[in-house]
Amino acid sequence: MTKSAKIGVLLANLGTPDSPTPKSISRYLWQFLTDPRVVDLPRCKWYPLLKAIILPLRSKRIAKNYQAIWTEQGSPLLAISRQQKDALQAYLDTQNINAQVEIAMTYGNPSIQSTVKNLLKNQVERIIVLPLYPQYSSSTTGAVFDAFANALKEERGLVPFDFIHSYHIDENYINALANSIKVRLKSDEFLLFSYHGIPLRYEKMGDYYREHCKQTTIAVVNKLGLTENQWGMTFQSRFGREEWLQPYTDKFLESAATQNIQKIAVICPGFSVDCLETIEEIDKENRENFLTNGGQSYQYIPALNVEHTHIEMMGKLILEKLA
């Protein structure tokens, strides 16, 4: 491959409904919840339950939450992802890299399949896939890999590709997180690292997501010079009745005041883009949860989104693959 060869860069994230309506959300959730990487229950049991009970009820409830955060540009996740794409494209241009940067979603639009087709149509000679999940999990990064592999199955010619597995202790990522926290965290605030949870059963089956979360947290804590009583780590967004990774974020915040934690700042290092889970669940629902249970002040520290340190980190991950 020559130095001027065109590179396709695929920024992958979870996805979003096309609109904040129950019908659109139901269609999106069907894609999401029928992926065996996400829910591995037998189809004969899971699908009827999903169709008859879960989708009708959950779609209506979630629609209200999406409507509360929807923008003229669509969902925050999609709008910010587009900004990330443009910013990364500009960064790679300054590095004289002949690249076409695209965003793609595991569920919803733009799909990974359609994005890969578009890149190949534009004759890229190599694709670099960057799942925007710093910490590997089979239910997120693994699902991106499946979707990307399925997209390539339709092609007779297999384009060379690189798949960035994780970047949970990448120096530029840790520095970006630490800098974002440093300019916002007050000296009397307890810092809570909240990560999206996964079923405990998945960990027992070999998913090492929790360990990646721990390594990220410890690296940031060391960078900031925090003591043991100044921070904690929890897991959010559990779904269903089975046990997930603990401690649970909502339960921790309910009882934090009884542990003499009156002022708190929450950051979600696993989210590269602010979305429903951070804006609605963490910044709104859990704020109310903490304050109504004796807390005095609550701060949500936003995702890295389009901060220049975040875009530069992405760019350097790409450049490392091209070295």
UniProtKB/Swiss-Prot annotation:
Q: Which UniProt keywords apply?
A: Cytoplasm, Heme biosynthesis, Iron, Lyase, Metal-binding, Porphyrin biosynthesis
Q: Does the keyword Metal-binding apply?
A: yes
Q: Which domain of life is it from?
A: Bacteria
A single Gene Ontology CC term: cytoplasm
InterPro entries for the chain: Ferrochelatase, Ferrochelatase_AS, Ferrochelatase_C, Ferrochelatase_N
Compartments (UniProt record): Cytoplasm
Q: Which residues cross the membrane?
A: none
A GO molecular-function descriptor: ferrochelatase activity
Give the metabolic or biological pathway. Answer: Porphyrin-containing compound metabolism; protoheme biosynthesis; protoheme from protoporphyrin-IX: step 1/1
- Catalytic reaction equation(s): heme b + 2 H(+) = protoporphyrin IX + Fe(2+)
Instruction: Give the EC number.
Output: 4.98.1.1
Residues reported in the UniProt entry to bind Fe cation: 196, 277
GO biological process, any: heme biosynthetic process
Principal subcellular localisation of the protein:
cytoplasm
Question: Into which family does the record put it?
Answer: Belongs to the ferrochelatase family.
- Function noted in UniProt: Catalyzes the ferrous insertion into protoporphyrin IX.
Q: What is this protein called?
A: Ferrochelatase
- The record lists the organism as Haemophilus influenzae (strain 86-028NP)
